[in-house]
Amino acid sequence: MQAVEQQKKSKLWALLSGILGIVWGGLIFVAPSYILPNIFSIVIFSIVFPFTAPSEETLQILHQTQTMFIYLVAFIWVMFIVARISHRYYKKTGEVPYWVTKIFLLAASLGVIATLPVLLSYIPGLTGINDVTLQIGGMGSILIITGGVSGLLGLISGAGYIISLNRFDR
């Protein structure tokens, strides 16, 4: 009997997945401390002075924060689509270890789960869902932790994809 030889897979999806995973992990760990430094002052301001009129600067910071969040949500959904495609593309091949594709898919899925309550609040009629979600005992912190775990797993799997690129030359 002749052995059926599997055709070589392209390393484009591995490169794209690696870059997306590393960038996502970097964004998750850098964003709270560098990109959104004023978010904590806004939260404290809104807790301490709930009945004062917000200043123009505060409104601008809120707008920038919301814009940054929309970019992060778009990034995580693109990463989720790429993770699904690359998981299916490299299934049962030797180029990319199976655990790398699984962890990348898990990282993207956790990121999508963390963004769902806020995304649903943009739908007319469901605008109060974010308030309800954040009022459930510690749900806001659970979503933040889920995003952080997603970033860590994205960083690990992105590095796994980049390391596995040298397997394609064999």
What do the predicted segments below correspond to?
Residues M1-P37, I163-R170:
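Cytosolic juxtamembrane helix and N-cap/initiation of the first transmembrane helix
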Residues A3-S10, V82-V100, L153-R170:
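Cytosolic juxtamembrane helix at the C-terminal end of the final transmembrane segment
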Residues Q6-K9, W13, T58-L62, Y89-I103, ...:
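Membrane-interfacial loop-to-transmembrane-helix junctions in polytopic alpha-helical membrane proteins
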Residues K11-G18, G25, L105-A108, I144, ...:
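Residues within membrane-spanning alpha-helices of integral membrane proteins
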Residues S17-G21, E95-L116:
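Transmembrane alpha-helical segments of multi-pass membrane proteins
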Residues A31-Y34, N38-I44, S86-K92, S121-D131, ...:
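Juxtamembrane transmembrane-helix termini
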Residues N38-Q66, L116-T146:
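Interfacial non-cytosolic loop connecting adjacent transmembrane helices
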Residues Q66-R84:
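Generic alpha-helical transmembrane segments
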